[in-house]
Design a protein with these regions (language model features):
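Electropositive, gly/pro-rich neighborhoods at or near active sites that engage anionic ligands
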Residues: 1-82, 96
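Structural motif
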Residues: 84-86, 200-201
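Histidine-anchored nucleotide/phosphate-binding helix
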Residues: 93-112, 116
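C-terminal functional extensions of proteins
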Residues: 119-121, 128-257
Length: 257
């Protein structure tokens, strides 16, 4: 990402490529990575080694580059700077790696920005839990002390529980950890140096959180909040409902303004 000419675009592409790896859409995964020594049936999948996983991820990223984008608001996203960001993670593995890189990029883009990486409290299919996210992030820190480790230590990135245990996301029933963080940041530090209201971004990752349960939530947020729905369409049901094709990508930025 750091060596890319467009680091935000690279972070978004990696996030979308990672979102393919979903136990709830295993057939879609197999269709993309069939060239690897991939094993399993249509209900489960596994990789024999790290080389297989790397091959599969590159195949997925190529698919992102070559696929149609049902919504492409990347330019609008790039034109904004966000002071506070909540990233609601989806799947464990490659997907949460993509979300971590996106959180890192968003924390770097705006001076004084803070980002919350949010995960389920309890397990649901292969969705990452807060305990798994913390373990994963600790490994990432070892490889990136300049940013990920420093950002965790100085509070630019926080790891928080959503208080939920579902593949969907009910934004009216989030837990104490994320609620307290948002309340604190939006009141104590809720204005910038010029006294203007801080600008917030809510990132909803994956089919369950962004396509199935919160597709229109941008209409209902406060005026200083934007919502980014970010996902790869991996099922015929969702494709038909949205007027899309399987493997189409969604990068939809919305608000109530």
């Amino acid at each position: 990402v750091d060596n890319s000419e467009d680091s935000l675009k690279s972070a978004i592409e990696i996030a979308l490529a990672g979102n393919l790896f979903d136990a709830g859409a295993a057939q879609a995964v197999q269709n993309v990575v069939g060239g690897s020594s991939f094993k399993g049936d249509s209900n489960k999948f596994a990789f024999k080694n790290s080389e297989d996983l790397q091959f599969a991820f590159e195949a997925s990223r190529k698919r992102v580059r070559n696929s149609e984008w049902l919504c492409d608001d990347l330019d609008e996203l790039r034109a904004n700077e966000y002071d506070r960001v909540c990233v609601f993670c989806d799947n464990a593995g490659a997907d949460v790696l993509g979300m971590t890189l996106l959180a890192r990029e968003l924390a770097k883009r705006t001076k004084g920005a803070k980002v919350a990486l949010v995960a389920n409290e309890l397990a649901a299919l292969n969705d990452v839990t807060i305990n798994e996210l913390e373990e994963f992030y600790q490994v990432c820190e070892q490889h990136d002390p300049e940013y990920l480790q420093l950002y965790r230590e100085n509070g630019k990135i926080a790891l928080l529980s959503s208080g939920q245990a579902s593949t969907l996301l009910n934004l009216n029933a989030t837990g104490k950890d994320i609620n307290d963080w948002v309340k604190r940041e939006d009141t104590v530090g809720g204005v910038d140096m010029e006294g203007k209201k801080l600008k917030w971004l809510v990132v909803l990752d994956g089919m369950g959180r962004s396509l199935e349960s919160n597709w229109e939530c941008g209409k209902y947020v406060q005026p200083h909040v934007d919502v980014l729905n970010l996902a790869m369409v991996k099922s015929e049901i969702n494709a038909k409902r949205l007027g899309a094709n399987v493997y189409d990508c969604v990068c939809k930025l919305s608000n109530s303004r």
